[in-house]
């Protein structure tokens, strides 16, 4: 009985001193603590399918890859279909949707602070060196984040949802660069590997690997500094300029946006069509030549009217869109080549004649100048001779008169 009583007393004291005190103290310790808001996992729903523009921005922003764009016969377009089992209810898709198609009962609360980019896994940048300024991307952008600044098109990356509608309508294969996490990680890893070899002295530097010193396209450069880390020469990122170079090509190898390069060709997406100008309808305003970014429109030396060179045409359609009289038509490449064949041959012949005329004119000018110099020299010599002879005749006449005077 005594042992049992002592045990009960011990339990009573333990509970009173330890557990009860702990619970009492817990109230006072946590009186100012605000627990975080918790939301149930409620996947978003396609609330307004009629508003969807099938931009695929929701799909691009989903971190769980739970959204697929599937064609819907009722609405005659692709609509997002969300896998509820994969969805993590992050609400990224709701944030990026430009038309408010998706809806969710509860998603993360907006907090005051710095402005962040739209959630996405890739960024799009227009390559100003390859862009032909057709304006297709600006017109196709569903949220109007592409604008023309100082003669070139620029994407506002903070507002861009990476729907890639601009890429779909761009006539050039490589004019819009996609910078994603995977590519960036690969380039950074490569740069670290080269940098470590450089620091430890294990880097084998090969000179003249590339044919000439590369240049930096300022519109593509994000100033990450990776190229500068691996460069054995000197790169000025403030001026976007390669200062010293041994032509090793390491900077080109690690650049994630292809901003540093030697040359990038313009590759048209379509080659099954081409544009041709109807000379009977053309009024010779030359607006088409002004809007053409690839230099495919030339002016005929014979007719003084514009024509399109199929080899240079990128099929952007800016010329046809801007023509005030609708004189530019879409035809097959063979027809376009046949239509301008005569004009190209004429221009080559006229250019050849003009070059010959310029050459002959230069030669004629030189010959004429030499003749004039020679004539002037001979004229001076003839003048001297005649003056000399006249002086001689006068002297002889004086001598005769003098002799006659003495004899008389």
Curated annotation (Swiss-Prot):
List residues of the 4Fe-4S ferredoxin-type domain. 42-72, 78-107, 122-151, 151-181, 212-241, 233-265, 273-302, 304-333
Give the intrachain disulfide bonds: none
User: What PROSITE patterns is this protein classified in?
Assistant: 4FE4S_FER_1 (PS00198), 4FE4S_FER_2 (PS51379)
Q: Which UniProt keywords apply?
A: 4Fe-4S, Electron transport, Iron, Iron-sulfur, Metal-binding, Repeat, Transport
Q: What one GO molecular function would you report for this record?
A: oxidoreductase activity
Q: Which residues cross the membrane?
A: none
InterPro entries under this entry? 4Fe4S_Fe-S-bd, 4Fe4S_Fe_S_CS, Fe-S_Ferredoxin
Q: Can you tell me which residues bind [4Fe-4S] cluster?
A: 52, 55, 58, 62, 87, 90, 93, 97, 131, 134, 137, 141, 160, 163, 166, 170, 282, 285, 288, 292
The lineage's top-level taxon is Archaea
Q: Which Pfam families match?
A: Fer4, Fer4_7
Task: Report the PANTHER family cross-referenced here.
Answer: ADENYLYLSULFATE REDUCTASE, BETA SUBUNIT (PTHR43687), FERREDOXIN III (PTHR43687:SF1)
* Protein's name in the database: Uncharacterized polyferredoxin-like protein MJ0514.2
Species name: Methanocaldococcus jannaschii (strain ATCC 43067 / DSM 2661 / JAL-1 / JCM 10045 / NBRC 100440)
């Amino acid at each position: 009985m005594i042992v049992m009583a002592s045990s009960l007393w011990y339990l009573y004291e333990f509970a009173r001193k330890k557990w009860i005190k702990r619970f009492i103290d817990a109230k006072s310790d946590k009186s100012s603590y605000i627990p975080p808001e918790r939301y149930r996992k409620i996947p978003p729903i396609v609330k307004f399918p009629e508003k969807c523009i099938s931009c695929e921005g929701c799909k691009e922003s989903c971190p769980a890859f739970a959204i697929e764009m599937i064609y819907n016969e009722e609405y005659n377009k692709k609509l997002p279909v969300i896998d509820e089992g994969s969805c993590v209810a992050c609400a990224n898709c709701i944030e990026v949707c430009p038309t408010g198609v998706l809806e969710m009962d509860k998603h993360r609360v907006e907090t005051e602070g710095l402005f962040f980019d739209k959630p996405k896994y890739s960024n799009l940048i227009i390559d100003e060196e390859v862009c032909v300024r057709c304006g297709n991307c600006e017109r196709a952008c569903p949220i109007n984040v592409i604008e023309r600044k100082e003669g070139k098109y620029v994407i506002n990356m903070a507002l861009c949802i990476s729907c890639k509608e601009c890429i779909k309508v761009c006539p050039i294969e490589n004019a819009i660069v996609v910078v994603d996490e995977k590519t960036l990680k690969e380039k950074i890893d490569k740069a670290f590997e080269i940098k470590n070899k450089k620091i430890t002295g294990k880097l084998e530097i090969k000179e003249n690997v590339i044919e000439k010193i590369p240049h930096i396209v300022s519109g593509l450069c994000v100033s990450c500094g990776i190229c500068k880390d691996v460069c054995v020469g000197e790169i000025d990122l403030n001026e976007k300029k390669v200062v010293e170079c041994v032509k090793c090509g390491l900077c080109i190898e690690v650049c994630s946006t292809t901003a540093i390069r030697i040359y990038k060709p313009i590759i048209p997406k379509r080659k099954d069509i081409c544009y041709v100008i109807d000379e009977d309808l053309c009024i010779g305003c030359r607006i088409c030549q002004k809007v053409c970014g690839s230099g495919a429109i030339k002016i005929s030396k014979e007719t003084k009217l514009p024509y399109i060179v199929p080899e240079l045409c990128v099929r952007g359609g800016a010329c046809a869109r801007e023509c005030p009289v609708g004189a530019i038509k879409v035809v097959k490449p063979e027809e376009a080549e046949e239509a301008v064949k005569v004009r190209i041959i004429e221009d080559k012949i006229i250019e050849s004649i003009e070059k010959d005329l310029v050459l002959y004119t230069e030669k004629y000018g030189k010959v004429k100048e030499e003749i004039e110099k020679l004539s002037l020299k001979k004229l001076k010599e003839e003048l001297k001779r005649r003056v000399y002879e006249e002086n001689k005749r006068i002297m002889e006449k004086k001598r005769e008169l003098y002799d006659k005077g003495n004899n008389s």
